[in-house]
From Swiss-Prot:
BP GO terms, sorted: mRNA processing; RNA splicing; tRNA processing
GO MF term list: RNA binding
Listed name of the protein: Maturase K
Keyword field contains Membrane: no
Source organism phylogeny: Eukaryota, Viridiplantae, Streptophyta, Embryophyta, Tracheophyta
Keyword annotations from UniProtKB, A to Z: Chloroplast, mRNA processing, Plastid, RNA-binding, tRNA processing
Function: Usually encoded in the trnK tRNA gene intron. Probably assists in splicing its own and other chloroplast group II introns.
Major location category of this protein: plastid
Family named by the database record: Belongs to the intron maturase 2 family. MatK subfamily.
Organism of provenance: Beta vulgaris (Sugar beet)
One CC-aspect GO term: chloroplast
Coiled-coil ranges from the UniProt annotation: none
Subcellular location: Plastid, Chloroplast
Amino acid sequence: MEEFQGHIELDRSWQHNFFYPLIFQEYIYAFAYDHGLNKSILLENSGDKKYSLLIVKRLITRMSQQNHLILSANDSNQNEIFGHKNKKKLYSEMITEGFAVIVEIPFSLLLISSLEGKEIVKSHNLRSIHSIFPFLEDKFLHLNYVLDILIPYPAHLEILVQTLRYWLKDASSLHFLRFFLYEYRNWNSLITQKEFISFLKKRNQRLFLFLYNFHVCEYESLFVFLRNQSSYLRSTSFGALLERIHFYGKIKYLVKVFTNDLGVIQWFFKEPFPHYVRYQGKSILASKGTFFLMHKWKYYIIYFWQCNFSVWSQPRKIYINRLSNHSLDFMGFFSSVRLNSSVIRSQLLENSFLIENIIKKFDTIVPIIPLVGSLAKAKFCNVLGHPVSKSVWADLSDSDIIDRFGRICRNLSHYYSGSSRKKSLYRIKYILRLSCARTLSRKHKSTVRSFLKRLGSEFLEEFFTEEEKVLSLILPRDSSTSWGLYKRRIWYLDIICIHKLVNDE
């Protein structure tokens, strides 16, 4: 983000949030090439990684003309331009990639300024998704019910633009965005969740991910405030509070009402405070309250989506579960609150007593069946979990094959290091090790047994994490201390995303 600040002049148009002129700047496309998710669009050919300034100059020249967005049929049928057969598709992808970089600028600057104001130096630690689990472990032991929520996708692309317009006041940029969204889909039709996911995978991922993430963050900014002020919204019609334009003025009015109503303040302390956590399109809302209270929260959220974002969600997308007897499928773990009972014998003179203590423990379990399904889909094993050779990797060198398998195994071990039961993880490691051995033996046309015998223990070391290597050198395998360290849960602050095998849907 510091690179942007060095290139962008803070002139009058920038101060008034006019971002449209930036689409004509060459350095924007250079940043899009460096940071974009689809880097191939700015390459002169598929085998060359050199950034093509010539393509960008042609694009900017064409956009500066009166008919910059009109491409004739002959343009699409011309010869290849730097490896791309369709010039219209190439230009569209380049513009949307650059536009995605532009709309990210103000929000990145807001993030940097907020972190500097709070004197937070190592902000990357706050991005670790593993930091959620210590929070759940600390809070969930004292809670009763949880709402398992699937955040609905917007039913129309115009909703995304309408949400963005309250922050981005440049009308030209919004019209520009509408134009390209119209190119992707008929503007007058609705979209389903499956079609929206298809957009994210097949189209400009950076732009659509930004629009969806901004849509979710805007929903959360309103919902979290209303959740915090839920004590005095019971006697107030919340439908009138959700108009976004005058929302901040209504916040001041609500605070004034709150300070003047002592009866409502007394009721506030009786209301169990819910805890809210989200990752991607799934969120959870947990509370110490009763089932009736969670039922009210469920329909409150549904009406909240309808009134404020024109999103109609079915009640079956929100589940009410009791933490004591349900596992929560969240971020690749099965999490639950388990009751451990311990019986203590107490002797008092001639009488003895049995005292049963119940201790709550937060369990995080590796979901073995979904993981095996993901491995089967990736052709590492069959549907029953029996390892098979990865035939598409058989043409690689031995070191590349071992490195690829070992990297997947280490990444999964790293992510699931916080699991309270690691036996399932050992099975996943076994599948990957044997699949690697089968791939190598297939390449060299030998048996798996003879190949493993020839490689020896050096082959298995590639599948160990750094922590396991250190422990194996310091402590013997059969010691109780070593076994206790292997079983201990460890949460890391350097994990910012879920492995694709964990998050495969």
